[in-house]
Amino acid sequence: MADRFRLIRCGSIAAVTLLCAVSVHGAEADASYADARKAFQDAYARVAANFPDESAADSEALKSYPLYPYLEAARIRQALNGSPDSLARADQLAADFIAAHEQAPVSRGLRRAFLDSLARRSRWGLFIEAYRESGATDAERCQSFTAHIELGKTAGLAGDIARQWLTPRSLPECDRPFAWLKANGLLTPDLIEKRVRLALEIGNVAFARQIIQQLPADGVGPYLQWASLLEHPQGGLDTLIASPDLAVDPMALLAGWTRLARTNPAAASERYQALMSARGLTREAASPYALALALSLAWNHDPAALEYFDLVASRDFDDSSLEWRARAAILAADWKVASESIVAMSENNRQTARWRYWAARAAAQLHDSSQARRLYESLLSDDNYYSAMAAARLHRTVIPLLQTLPPDQELLASIERVPAMERARELFLCGMRQEALAEWQLGYGSLSEAQRLQSIRVAAAWRWYDQAIAVASAQRVFNDYVLLYPRPFDTEVEQAARLAQLEPGLIYGVLRQESLYRVDAVSSADARGLMQLQLDTARRTARQWKRPKPDLSDLFDPATSTLLGAARLRTLLDQFDGQIPVALAAYNAGANAVVRWLPAKSVDSDVWIENIPYGETRGYVQRILWHVLTFTWLHTKEAQETKSWLSPIRAIPRTDADNRALAGVAHRQGPG
């Protein structure tokens, strides 16, 4: 690996100081394009604000700016929303622009807008000319079917529409093609049943009920029963227990059982034997039911999980379920079952750092100290949470293995001369990240392997840190900690650390994991900014800490985000008795969830972390612990002690407020 990446192993951070070069070429480009960039941003903003077309006033400098086509595309999109008498010209402009930039990222957004406009206006001939199957969305594909139907070009179309029909979700853009399929007698009961099953298999009950209505009356019963089992699993299963002769689709029965096991494992446990007996299921046939219940019990830290795992046939285990059997055994301190579960995993899974660590823990508990030591030592060079845990078990300190990717100025300059990379940089500087990523991907695809490695440094020099880290991951460059663990927000982090009385390394660890340094990051849950705070959480924290009430835009301010994020973390640390892994889990999953996960009595921290039910949260805690170690090592240049990682997770008495919160919160469950 070292030869391929031309990495330099360094015993100290000082040895690589001279290697941390910033792209001189990028700085020169930044200066040379400054005026044109400002003109572009101003003009682009005026288009977004729906100002009239001002292209006649564009300067030659603006026209020669690499992003000028993006301004042209924006103006054409604006024209496509213009008055009816101007649309013919807009259509021609759009068609000409797309033809001139057929393969370029700049045409993608315009093509989508053009197709949408043509579909709304039923300009089907132009639609077919502009449509490309490659990269088309489901909606655009449906619109293309409509175009062919309206133009009478239906040869071979039925098979394509039938394939599109087989989706488990609503596709309103395909209403016309599906109606055409039905009118031509091609929407058969078999096709309808297949779509109903697809919807039911993913739990999309409301949509399944809509499609069920299209079935012949004598065919709806089994599917309505399936839907009812998903909506009301406990009542439906009780009916099937009370009426052993009542027919039920085997997939519907298992789906209803799985839904009950996940939402109410206690109720499922009470009914397991009765259901198996009533339906006449042999031990072999009952195995999937035992597995569904065992998994849910394991996610809920119920020791009965192991009893049901014992009822599962070996053929029904996969790596994911074996992992949860191992976790349940680890939590129950049944190290023999834990070891057996690890041995049963696939070779690839068994050799991961996670399961080598737990194999070592099991060996130690089963008094095979030599095997435990061998496995622990095999982990030490892995540089991750498990290697640090192994070091703690061996009473050793941790020094991350620094492998530096040295800069090659010739390659760096060659990368920045690639037109797509130049556009990517300018788009990034203009805050157009989605477009910047598309141009980066185009440019990256044209690079040599050596250039791709150096492109990590290019992105980092641009301060596009999340992209640098993403490319480094793709190139398997994990250990250039100087490059991949920057500290661009030291002023803000230090201020937040003083306020919340936290170590800066802890704040940086959370910041890196939450946003990868993206000031403008927005999650699917509408968490925003460097520390990924939702507005209500930020305002509640500000009120508690007597800080100004933030608006939504304030969450993108680095100082506000780091300060309120650190304050939130401090509040969670205080709530959970200073236990960092618990507070981190609460920062990610919410305090109410973590209250449910707290042990009734003290448990080893590695055991508790491994049994966090949400895979995202488990990985989140583990990665941040490693990030904190790395940031602290970079700052202090000292070997890091991890013996504190072994401190048990202590039970914390629940308050009345905790109990009220638990009563009002649905338990999101699922393996991970």
Where are these regions (language model features)?
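Generic helix N-cap/helix-start motif at coil->alpha-helix transitions
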Residues: 30-39, 51, 64-72, 87-90, ...
